[in-house]
């Protein structure tokens, strides 16, 4: 398939710059795959589409203040560093700008010198492997003080509350970007779903370069995903498998959940607990094993995320739904509105 098959026109004014308040007041475009018809709702209407016994699977990853501003020792050149994946100890895979100023062996200084880094290598994707050093920890406290929340470049203004770029159920630190489908949930809505008999299972996928790396090839099958860390507990696997065995639906909250479950599922849809790294790339033609419904935001043109939802619902149905969403004034991308694909 060609990359241009996943293009669409979006007026810049429909790229959401701030989240709505409350979270579940965002709009919800419901796409019924069977029949292809659409409904216009709000996210707080979600309970009417779920049934007792269904299991909602969420990603409990937490975004870290992964953007650091520093300078190169010796030259004073200003350098931007985005932490992607922790490898071992204080060694991280990172993206740097401008890359030409950061060769192997370069030393970087952050803050007033309380955090330093040495470039140990270059990744195939053009990133840098950096080993950080500091005299006074802990690391998390240093990041909180020196780092910034790594908002996507299309968001031009910081949210008044940085916590709005976290889900209310975020637990495990490690992501360079939020699993945005989950941003619409409130504690009240989760409570309502539980009281309705909806099971909620938590998995983990730390969002890194694999989720938002642009596709630079014409033939999408040639694109190579960057690996991201995932974990599925025995309890989560048991909850999901029990729901499916009883004939209930597995509803994935976001593409990160889809990629995790499809990674650990057998051919007949049984979920196995475990952890590791996944570089699964889902595009039209893929046969889903693990999920029945999907909650997701509106994604960028030509992105792997748009390809994934097109694989699930059909490319034409998705692009038709996007055209309707544009016409009806829906808000797009990370702080935008949501879709429920049934």
From Swiss-Prot:
Name used for this protein in its record: S-adenosylmethionine:tRNA ribosyltransferase-isomerase
Coarse class of the protein's main subcellular location: cytoplasm
Keywords: Cytoplasm, Queuosine biosynthesis, S-adenosyl-L-methionine, Transferase
Gene Ontology CC: cytoplasm
EC number: 2.4.99.17
Catalytic activity: 7-aminomethyl-7-carbaguanosine(34) in tRNA + S-adenosyl-L-methionine = epoxyqueuosine(34) in tRNA + adenine + L-methionine + 2 H(+)
Pfam family, one: Queuosine_synth
InterPro entries membership: QueA, QueA_dom1, QueA_dom2, QueA_sf
Transmembrane segments: none
Top EC group: transferase
